[in-house]
Every structure is written in C-alpha cells, then in structure tokens.
C-alpha cells in the first residue's frame, strides 16, 4: 500500500465533522459539532476563521446561490457568509428532543439527504430524510442508530450509506428522477479491529474513502468487491470524515475528534481534533449543492 504524507491544521475540535470544499471561495469548511463552531480554511493563504453558533452544528454544505446550508440540532438553515444572517428552512423530529442531525449530502438533483441520531445513541432511534425543493423532510430509512456517511456513484444508480454500529457500507438502488432508494446488498463489511465506519466520500474511480472512528485513518474500499485497497494512516484514533477538494480535487480534507479519549490518550495523541490535508493520486468530484 502507498504511504501518504499529511499536513495538519490546528483546530482541536471535540467532534470535528462535515468537511466541505467551496469552489467559489477556494476553501475548506468543517464543523465542531458539540461546540457549535464553523471553520473555514483558505487553502492558498492558510488562514483559518471560526464562527460560533448557539446550537450543535452538525453539517455544512453549499446552497445553489452561494450561501451555506447548515444543520443545527434538528433544524436546517441557510447562512449568508457576508451578512452572517441565518434563515431557518425546515425541521425534523421536534417531538424527539434527544435527537439531532448528523451527516448529510446532496444528490445530483440537489435534494438534501440527512440523517439523525439520539444523543444517547439509543439503538434504532435515528432516521434518514430526503429534503427537496418543497422543504418537506421525507423519511427514507428508520431504525438507524448513527446515520452517517453517504455517497452516490457517477451514474447515479447506486447510493452508499453507513449506519455506523453495523460496521457495514450498504448499497441501495437509486432512482435519480424520483429519489427513491431500495436496498440491494452489503458492499463492505468492516472488521472490529479497523474501528467503525463514519463519514465517507467517493473518488472518480468509484472507490470509497471512509473515515474509521477508532481506526486511526481513512481507508479506501472497493465497493464492488468489498476489498480494502489502501489506508491513510493518521496519528489520532478517532477519524470522523473526509472530502475531496483543492484546485485539482485531489486533496483530501480529513476531520478528527477528541471525544471518548482520556486525558492520557489526549497527551499520547495531541493532534486529535485537528484537521489533516492529504494529496491523493485519485480525484473526487465537486459536491452537489442544495436546490430549494
């Protein structure tokens, strides 16, 4: 397997997540969920800025008008970076105060797919929603525990999805026009010693780059054969998500976490919670934006 080199961006996130590449701004965004922080790192200047919100901030991605789309607790909002104005768009599970949003992405039609979990991590308490132009969340999957990473194939015929505790990446038939999904097969089974699958992204070769929580790296899996192809080894235990970006879409931004680490472990792994940049030999695609 290839050996990768990395550079790190000091962030010290308790729970870093949701890396997103903004083409217009040529910068990476990510969040620190429990601390409600939104980070922006300009790739050329190396400058990092932080904005804080009085909510758990679980997701950042792009809207069709250049605004950001944020998930805060159980609500989705648009955020104008120039005015810093937040506009609420929709909400789910208002009757489940222990639940919050987790990971999310947009499909090629601009629909937002976003999952929930219980902050107590109660088994089966999470769901996966699809949100279209009418801003009405429609439940697609239920009985989830930690709704997490997702990706679509280039032909838009397969949707990959992770419910973290299952240690599986599932493949669903995907119908682009309607947004319907139907379970097809388990694409990847992840053994216990490799940790838990968390966030993921897909490259132009159709391979899945998966952050392994408790697995000290990002693992590249072949979802057709289920085989592990390679691994980006990182000096932290809890790797949470990854996304392609940069001018050539060949830079992987990787988020990590400090949660569930003791004081001694944090001394042993001081870069936990920081963000890592890794150049790869494969490229990703620009993330789809939310159309509403």
Segments (PLM) and residue ranges:
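A short beta-strand motif characteristic of beta-propeller blades
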Residues: 4-10, 46-52, 87-94, 136-142, ...
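Beta-rich, blade/repeat-based domains predominating
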Residues: 11-25, 54-69, 95-111, 140-158, ...
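Conserved beta-strand positions in repeat-built beta-propeller and related beta-rich domains
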Residues: 22-23, 28-33, 69-74, 112-122, ...
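Hydrophobic/aromatic beta-strand positions that recur at structurally equivalent sites within the blades
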Residues: 31, 41, 79-81, 129-131, ...
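A short loop-to-beta-strand structural motif that recurs across blades of beta-propeller domains
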Residues: 37-39, 75-77, 126-129, 168-170, ...
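Hydrophobic alpha-helical segments and helix pairs
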Residues: 85-142
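Short loop/turn segments immediately following beta-strands, especially the blade-tip
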Residues: 172-180, 223, 280-285
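Blade-level signature of beta-propeller repeat domains, shared across WD40, Kelch, NHL, RCC1
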Residues: 243-292
